[in-house]
Amino acid sequence: KLKAKGFTSIGSENNLALFMGDFTGRNATIGVTATDDGKSVFAVAVLFDPSGEWNTLVNTYNYYKDLYTRKYGNPTISKEKNPAHLDSNTALMAEVHQGTVVWGSAWEVTGGNIELSIEKTSGFYEGMVMIRYRDSQNVETKIQKDLEDI
């Protein structure tokens, strides 16, 4: 389905396939995780290009939070906290880099959930906005299979 929408496959390993392309007008990397038999998708992650600008991250996050709120109603949970003591980009991005920022919202939707968050990246003082979709039935199927393996 992603290839039909213009996404380009950039690789796969085990049950994870990666694609690049345009997601709602923004460049993004899409990770699709399938069940062990490869027949069902149980998680999809959308990773937007990293940014070293706090305002860019928050504006992107707020745009998608508004979109999902319009479609699914208010988030089931939302926590937006950056412990920086100064309102400067350097101070705010330093907190992202240290992993102390908690900036996310989640929606329980029919068949699964959606999580939206600002995450740190491997880059110096960079972060990215990430959206995760999980299919609860296929997640449970995978958990049951994994329980059999242990």
Q: Which stretches of residues belong to each language-model region?
A:
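Non-cytosolic coordination micro-motifs
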Residues: K1-N14, D49-I150
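Short N-terminal edge-element motif at the start of the domain
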Residues: K1-T33
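Mid-chain, structured segments of secreted extracytoplasmic proteins
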Residues: G21-Y64
